[in-house]
Amino acid sequence: MTRYQNLVNGKWKSSEQEITIYSPINQEELGTVPAMTQTEADEAMQAARAALPAWRALSAIERAAYLHKTAAILERDKEEIGTILAKEVAKGIKAAIGEVVRTADLIRYAAEEGLRITGQAMEGGGFEAASKNKLAVVRRESVGIVLAIAPFNYPVNLSASKIAPALIAGNVVMFKPPTQGSISGLLLAKAFEEAGIPAGVFNTITGRGSEIGDYIIEHKEVNFINFTGSTPIGERIGRLAGMRPIMLELGGKDAALVLEDADLEHAAKQIVAGAFSYSGQRCTAIKRVIVLESVADKLATLLQEEVSKLTVGDPFDNADITPVIDNASADFIWGLIEDAQEKEAQALTPIKREGNLLWPVLFDQVTKDMKVAWEEPFGPVLPIIRVASVEEAIAFANESEFGLQSSVFTNDFKKAFEIAEKLEVGTVHINNKTQRGPDNFPFLGVKGSGAGVQGIKYSIEAMTNVKSIVFDVK
């Protein structure tokens, strides 16, 4: 069994305590990762702080060269990393390899986008007469140490979406991968290390949340926190962060609104793809369908047909539905299913579970008193909610505590735009499934779904400070 190590100040280091990582597929032991202590976390933070001045002093072109090398290494090793990723988080092997390739593309784009983040010169004369002799040079400077905390569901891509923009902007990074997904995260770190990233610029921290979780968030050396995960943890990070800037990508209860004039066959295909990709373990998964009563029967039948085509089983067979991340997650999802059954939702698909493998469930006649109408399952469960009007559909969608994304299916462009304006979410997809990306697009949530705007350009800007240097020219 492989004993993985943390990258700290350019060296691979073990810890006295370790965490064994098991595959959600079959409980195979995949290896161990270090369980760092607070003292070891301090050492990593100190290394990052010491490395900051030299890294910040490099030109964007010099920093970009390291990112381009890293991207090339990821593409070279995509099969190896993708195989580990598939085992570690039970993701289909094709999708796992695709995640590594997408990550290489993201890192390249970040390297190039960093070259386009330039300053500006401003004259003061346009404001008041007394300021006509003033000239400002406005620059963007790195914030310092960025703490990047990634989720299990995209342990390579959503890690790099934080790391690459931070690095190209001149920041140094403390990377905390998810426990389940930490091996994949450390393989990403290995690519940066092989690319020659200077010692201390990129460091990793693995360990138990009870030991180092709050500690690294509150750490005095951290200047910016970039987190993807659950809303309760995100809210806690917000409280612990104090006055420091944060970027939070949190939960969602993304709704697909289906209007009477929609192409129902197209809508059904998009909804099922959006709901059940990676077994629904995506913050951007469609998690409820809100449909006009007049077309609900037909849509329900079409959705049932599409769900019946999904395959269930092993990620290495590229099954559509694979085991969820752990038994605790499966138990939570199962609780939502049982609650819906007890309250007389109509199951349109067989309900079956084997350990942490759940068959896809489609419920019709879901009402407001059912938990599945409101809670994020993070699993293969999709409720259909029938409404009498577009206004009711919008109100139901907006009643959620979350505000990540929505889809609207209609052939009326004007109506689609009007609805999009009224939905309290960060992104609205018209006649398409909810999804993250392309990675250069802005990605954000409102309400309980997050804080700050991601997307490569937006992430770079978020992880920099604006400095204005003002001259009196006469």
Regions found by a protein language model. Name each.
Residues 232-367, 430:
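ALDH superfamily catalytic-core signature
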Residues 27, 63, 85, 107, ...:
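Residue-level signal for inorganic ion chemistry
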Residues 1-32, 65, 69, 117-147, ...:
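Terminal low-complexity tails and localization/encapsulation signals of metabolic enzymes
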Residues 28-32, 222, 257, 311, ...:
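Conserved C-terminal structural/oligomerization subdomain of aldehyde/semialdehyde dehydrogenase
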Residues 75, 124-266, 387:
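Rossmann-like NAD(P) dinucleotide-binding subdomain of oxidoreductase/dehydrogenase enzymes
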Residues 172-174, 347, 427:
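A short hydrophobic/small-residue beta-strand
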Residues 30-36, 51-57, 147-148, 256-259, ...:
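Short, well-ordered beta-strand elements within core beta-sheets of diverse protein domains
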Residues 1-132, 309:
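N-terminal Rossmann-like NAD(P)+-binding subdomain of aldehyde/semialdehyde dehydrogenases
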